[in-house]
Amino acid sequence: VRIYRGRTTFGRKLLLLLAATLIAFSTARAQDVQAMDAWGAYKQAQKLDGQGKYAEAIAKYKQIAPEFVKQRQYGNAAGMYRRIGDDYAKLQQYDNAVAGWELEAKYSGLAGQTQISIAAKRRADMLRSKASLFVETTAGAVGGANAHGAKFEPKNGALLGAYAELDPAVHNPKTANPFYTDRFPALTGKKHAAYLLYFTYGQPFSSIKSHVDHARAAGTAIELGLQPLKGLGEVKDDAYLHQLARDIEASGVQVFLRFANEMNGDWVIWHTKDPNEYIAKFRLVAKVFHREAPNSVAMVWAPDRLPEYNIQDYYPGDDAVDWVGVSLYSIFDPSLDPLGQGEDRSSHLEKFDNIYKLYAARKPVFVSEGGVSYMYPEKKQDKTDWAVYKMNEFYATLPMLYPKVKAVFWFDSNHDASARIKNYMLSANPKLLAGYKQSVSSPFYLSSFGDESPIAYKPASAASPVPASPQRVSAYVKTWSPTLAKVTYAIGGRTVATAASPPWTAQIDFAPYGGKKIEVDVRAYDGRNKLVTTQKVPVSVK
């Protein structure tokens, strides 16, 4: 009996094994069929693309992509969403294109395709349409909400700065007449609080005596770009470093000490693939200057905005860093236009976003050098109008989107350490100069240490109510169009205000809407008066 039962048990096991094998085979077969169906549908979608039937192709790609996601074939899924985004762009349905590329970024990231993910996100950002509203208020209304209590930090507002010694219209290095501390304010119509100087590590502080003397006489500070041009190895805890700190402390001039900036980029000689090496040197310099120059020096850590992925690796620590800066430039580049129309659709303003989100909660953040070029250098094409728009939008909207920004330095030169001509010089372009004058005339931008902006901004949204009274309203409006010419505001279908330039400031009376939640329709138009986008912004009125 036991043998019989054993045979029965064995037989049952064999039957179960055969059944499991059949099920597994059937499942694999089903998956193979699904895969074959997916690739068959893909070929059909490609054919539809070739015929210009983009909507039908999109429908096919949308059937395929989820199947690849289910099978965790994330690279293939990303490819499908790339095509969905591309086809929506061809149909000029840009919001849908953005959604497709965002999914491409997501799944290419899951597939470990980092660069593809970054490129997809960049395309999405360039075509993304959005709007944010702000109301102007007083500095007293925001109090210390935007301050950190750091050395040299204005409670509200941003110190105005520039690099100007290479502009021949404002500075003659041989005769010191003119000198930029005098002539640059005359050129721009406003006193600047600080000027950037480059300084080679190992030189005595006395080598820039004329700059220090003029800064002291003009009541301006210095952002000292301390550069170890022989590499980090020359930076030691020695007599030179301590003497440099003592000399700066005795100078009577306030100094932002920007040590070895842009360290995250491989184009600087002090770049190291081992961030700990850089961090150790920064912390050494910070330790010496905090001890030897406690009244005159604020330590500045200033990476380049790119590459983003390694910025945090080089951060030396809160105890070593007083301010966080960033290099922020825009040069017209049509090669990345998602629509292939030869436009640069990037936002100069949003290039500040990453560094702000990373550090503004704990440190004063600022643009330690930056500018917008008025030439497309590769083609020698004039892009003044584009540059003026981007510059005006940047200075006008920066205080609204990034209220904890504490200084902005314009790079007033057409040259830097590279051989490439960059075209940022204000005196060389009357329209750019006029735009700069307009941009920095805002009282938010401060001419001296100790000043405070009388104005501030608060969001106008469902979460941040506005008073039921007339308000001075501004907006940040980002669209696929590189520039805009007009923005209108409508409530309940009725246009209540119109503005003709960034930050799209207008007077809107919210009194009729007290105690209500409303939608403000923000309509943006291009230079041909064509509607580009309508963004509905929910606003609570108290």
Predicted segments with their positions:
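Boundary/entry segment of secreted carbohydrate-active catalytic domains
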Residues: 35, 42, 122-204
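N-terminal carbohydrate-binding/catalytic regions of secreted carbohydrate-active enzymes
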Residues: 68, 72-75, 163-247, 397, ...
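Glycoside hydrolase catalytic-domain groove-lining segments
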Residues: 210-225, 329-377
